[in-house]
Amino acid sequence: MILSGLEIKDKLGSDIVIEPYDDSRLNPNSYNLRLHNELLVYDNNELDMKKPNTASPLIIPEEGLLLETGKLYLGRTIEYTESHNYVPMLEGRSSIGRLGLFVHVTAGFGDVGFCGFWTLEIFCVHPIRVYPGVEICQIFYHTIEGKYENYKSGKYQHNKGIQPSLLYKDFEK
């Protein structure tokens, strides 16, 4: 079951944290999250899953930044979120998708207990100008049934900003 917007609002401060929160971004069954002004781009065209891949910051100016096709941009939400007792999920807004902009390549699914900013895997079909603060995606919450454990991974939990892939740590186990 997906929580309604009113349920999301009722759970704020206990089971759900969205900071900063603004009522105008609440939808019937989701909440719009905004794009931070910083992006990361990988320094190399060839990436290696078993190694850390370096990335450089890119600031989105107020007049916007033209994104190139065939390039992955890592961004993040302005909003910090926490989810306790619900499964958070992230999707691009339909208006964003209709412009050919993907906000996540595969990672739209969160875990119960996740706390942090959402890293966005931004990819465009056509060159597109993006702006800081644009409502780029929406978070929604599923109920969970049965016994469960909260998210424990240290890789992305309590992040302070954009998180490049830490998959290489899985190979160190």
From Swiss-Prot:
Subunit comment: Homotrimer.
Entry keyword annotation includes Nucleotide-binding: yes
Signal sequence, start to end: none
Pfam families noted in UniProt: DCD
PANTHER family per UniProt: DCTP DEAMINASE
Binding site for dCTP: R93, S94, S95, I96, G97, R98, D111, T119, L120, E121, Q138, Y151
SUPFAM superfamilies per record: dUTPase-like (SSF51283)
Pathway the protein acts in: Pyrimidine metabolism; dUMP biosynthesis; dUMP from dCTP: step 1/1
Functional description taken from the UniProt entry: Bifunctional enzyme that catalyzes both the deamination of dCTP to dUTP and the hydrolysis of dUTP to dUMP without releasing the toxic dUTP intermediate.
Catalytic activity field: dCTP + 2 H2O = dUMP + NH4(+) + diphosphate
Organism of origin: Cytophaga hutchinsonii (strain ATCC 33406 / DSM 1761 / CIP 103989 / NBRC 15051 / NCIMB 9469 / D465)
Any one biological process term the GO annotation gives: dUTP biosynthetic process
Keywords assigned by UniProt, alphabetized: Hydrolase, Nucleotide metabolism, Nucleotide-binding
Name recorded for this polypeptide: dCTP deaminase, dUMP-forming
Catalytic center residues: E121 (proton donor/acceptor)
